[in-house]
Amino acid sequence: MKQETKCLHSGYVPKNGEPRQMPIYQSTTFKYDSSDAMGRLFDLEDSGYFYTRLQNPSNDMTAAKIADLEGGVAAMLTSSGQAANFFALFNICETGSHIVASSAIYGGTYNLLGVTMKKMGIDVTFVDQNLPEEELAKVFRPNTRAMFGETITNPTVSVLDIEKFARLAHSHGVPLIVDNTFATPVNCQPIKWGADIVTHSTTKYMDGHGVSVGGAIVD
């Protein structure tokens, strides 16, 4: 399917007798016939919807649409773009880890990496993304766990050489995480160029109307 078709139809395939358009499930909880059934869900022994903070059909369908647009396997929605970046990085890093990141990134993300994660014992080296590969390779350490950049930087609108960053990251055995907020998957799919994980602030162009705050992680 073309991207335009995916925007309209991906993520939701109605079965016989189901709504033609993707419904919005406005419920915090879901009903089951017994407390035993609920207990198995809360213990994560069975799969199913029981509490919207953990899972919701509307969220899952939207995440599936974003994953399809990005060419990923799956996606997860978050409360904001910064939450998406935090979860993507913190799932990989721990105290004592090191991150290599482009210095030409959104101010909130720069603060997340340079201040918030530093308080957690995670170090970051910010680099000029336009330096040649041999210069960038010098900043990697044995404890480097991830490389980070933005497809189109906010607000300087510099374009990241994703293939170059991917080569560097993979040659050092770490994943490349790319924030694709400004480009959106309509204009660029970083996974095609070597990125391993893609993040979004859906608040920006993906929302398109300035009425909601959200984020997404695509693997």
Please name every model-derived segment.
Residues M1, P19, Q55-N59, Y106, ...:
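Generic structural signal for well-ordered, non-membrane alpha-helical segments
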Residues M1-N56, A64:
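N-terminal "arm"/small-domain region of PLP-dependent enzymes with the aminotransferase-like
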Residues E4, E70, E150:
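Acidic-residue sensor for enzyme active/binding pockets
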Residues C7-V13, A75-D219:
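Conserved PLP-enzyme active-site core in the AAT-like
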Residues S34-F86, G108-T116:
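Conserved N-terminal alpha-helix of the aminotransferase class I/II PLP-enzyme fold
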